Amino acid sequence: MVSVLKGRFCLIGRRLVPSAVWVGLILLNVVVVTPQSGRTEPGEVDCPSLLGIGLVTGHSYCDVLIGTEAAEGIIVAVPPHAGPAIVTFTLHGRHTYSEEATTRGRGYARYLAITAVVAGDEVLARPVLLAEFHDAEDLVDRVGGGAGPAGLKAVAPVGGEDIRVTVPPGVNEVAIVGLQLEVERVDGREVFVTPGRSIAVIGDVQVEYRSR
């Protein structure tokens, strides 16, 4: 079969066929070559303030602290990689649970946390979390090692936002730092920007990459 392009048409044998159709026929025979398979593995995390291990999920929860430097944040190591890598994690609200306040109808809280993922002086992403607490069913997990009933900590993750951050080639670590927290409760609203304050927690840190 011989084909000759003629403007908007192709000559296939003795028939003129619209070029779009012919291009479609060509594409049907294209073999797509996929890149080398990547790897996904748990991230190596340097956590300056560990909340603890979740009793339900088994995830390690790390506090996100307000900071002005990358060194003050949660450091996630990125293995040597070909092309861009991807760091993923779940960003949760940080709620202090009180069964008494919840029973009295005064446990409601709304959290708006603004964070940043940085590599050196470059901001790669600004993840934002909006989470609400109404009752105990809103808690994602509970953390052991506390003085509360059954040895539970009062602080627990609430809500959750799945975050994916693209990491450029040549970058071997990123830092997750807090910027601002806005909390709304039944008795008012507060905004926190003081360095060192915990404003959220992260868990389930993973790194996706292709080895060099």
Predicted regions and their residues:
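Bacterial N-terminal signal peptides
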Residues: S19-V31
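Noncatalytic modules at the cell exterior or secretory-pathway interfaces
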Residues: A82-V87, V165-E182
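Short coil-to-beta strand junction motifs in C2/discoidin
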Residues: A101-A113
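Exposed low-complexity, polar/acidic, P/S/T/G-rich flexible segments that act as propeptides
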Residues: L181-R212
